[in-house]
Design a protein with these regions (language model features):
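Conserved catalytic cysteine-centered active-site region
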Residues: 82-90
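Solvent-exposed polar/charged
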Residues: 80-83, 111
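Residues at structural and domain junctions
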Residues: 61-64, 88, 95
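N-terminal beta1-alpha1-beta2 module of alpha/beta enzyme domains
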Residues: 1-81
């Protein structure tokens, strides 16, 4: 069994310095993979209760709901920073991207 981590792609840890340290530390510690999530856009206002917080508030909105790094660009950068750890996309919102350009980007990712 392998264990992995989620790369911070938004919030206070989503800085180049922090992501580099986290990714390289995970590789040194023997983790098997790093996952990167995908969020193209988050609405400014959500009226329905969010089921994953006690208050029902969607916590991303506390910081303006933006600032998410682009998934495949971050995965490419992680590939450049590491050598052995596997890289995974958690969920990819494919309809928001040109499928041919995305396929080419993914194929080029680990050169």
């Amino acid at each position: 069994m392998q264990f992995g981590i989620n790369a911070p792609f938004r919030g206070p840890l989503a800085t180049p310095e922090a992501i580099k340290k986290i990714a390289q530390s995970a590789e040194k510690l023997g983790y098997g993979y790093i996952i990167v999530s995908d969020h193209i856009v988050v609405p400014r206002k959500i009226d329905s209760p969010y089921p994953y917080s006690e208050s029902g508030a969607f916590t991303w909105l506390d910081s303006g709901g933006s600032g998410s790094m682009e998934q495949f660009t971050l995965l490419t950068w992680l590939a450049a920073l590491t050598s052995r750890i596997r890289l995974l996309s958690s969920v990819a919102v494919i309809p928001h991207r040109n499928p041919l350009v995305l396929a080419k980007s993914i194929a080029t990712m680990d050169v």
